[in-house]
Amino acid sequence: MQPYPVLETLFRHHLWANLRLLEVCTALSDEQRQSSSVGGYGSIGDTLQHFVRSERSYFSRINTGQPYRHPEDAPPLTFAEMAEWLRDSGEGLMLGVQTKIPVGEFVAA
């Protein structure tokens, strides 16, 4: 019996959910994307930028030991760029668990 690829499945769902969230937010008007709520990272647009950049930084840290540093003066990411970054990190995480964690080995929390 083959082990159930739990981490790969979780990362696959994570990628799907991130891209789905981005897809939903793409359909929002500019006014809606500029709105904010309690507990967010500013506006919806700012929150999207934050979570996509953070995802890239987490992935970089896992792969290289170093965080990704987004230039301070860089313009905001477009929706196409955010989708590309999310795909790159999401697919990289899935590939990482397929190739870096031997079958039957446990990952300590």
Predicted regions, residues:
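Aromatic-glycine hotspot motif
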Residues: 1-109
